[in-house]
């Protein structure tokens, strides 16, 4: 009797502890917030500055997996990974302070707008003696960044644990996915691939639930259920992988004398050694 009482007591403790997720759930309207950073964001921003920034073009850094989200309700046309990876890469290049990204993803829109400006100026200045002010030429890139999200593997590790005794019990489960990003640096002068970097990032999902189903008295049934699930945002995982790839590109570029950093040799040696440890 004492043993069963202790087990019920422990089960109730687990239930009440799990209820913390319920009582702390967001029930009010949340304000918009600026984008979350990742551990790789801090590391990327703390790199030594370059001696001269590099003009870089990114035409398309896309999802190459072709995978869709799994669904139990038939067809699902939502992709498994984000389709905005080009924007994420450009933001990472800006944050590094090593590169000057130029608009290439929607180049047709830029060229069309410049044509509109030229035609408008010619139309309104043709009857005047003033000279037509020419548009400044577009920047051209010394290097291009190519690649994309090449792999998304779901359920690479799954598992769980559960126990139940006299109607009281709890269980937990987890799942691990993985996303892989490839990034390559291409010279626009001769088309040579100067450097290729690939980074993999795991994505963790966890769930915990507990329940109690027990007759506490004649015709008196106690039934309690609680639980919560925690999923790592896939977009943040992709962001971290891309930022880590940019960081690796910069460090290996310094190591191979592709570009030069404006920092003492001791600092560069420390950065390179720390990178090689990973």
Report residues per predicted region:
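C-terminal motif of bacterial Sec signal peptides marking the signal peptidase cleavage site
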Residues: 15-18
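Extracellular loop and loop/strand-boundary signature of outer-membrane beta-barrel proteins
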Residues: 132, 167-171
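N-terminal segment of the mature soluble domain
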Residues: 54-55, 59-155, 178, 184-195
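Short alpha-helical segments and helix-capping/turn motifs at coil-helix boundaries
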Residues: 1, 39-43, 129-131
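C-terminal/domain-edge helix-coil "capping" segments
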Residues: 20-52, 153, 160-161, 172-278
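Hydrophobic helical h-region of N-terminal Sec-dependent signal peptides
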Residues: 9-13
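Bacterial N-terminal signal peptides that target proteins for export
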Residues: 1-8
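"Short basic amphipathic alpha-helical interaction patches in structured regions
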Residues: 72-74, 159-167
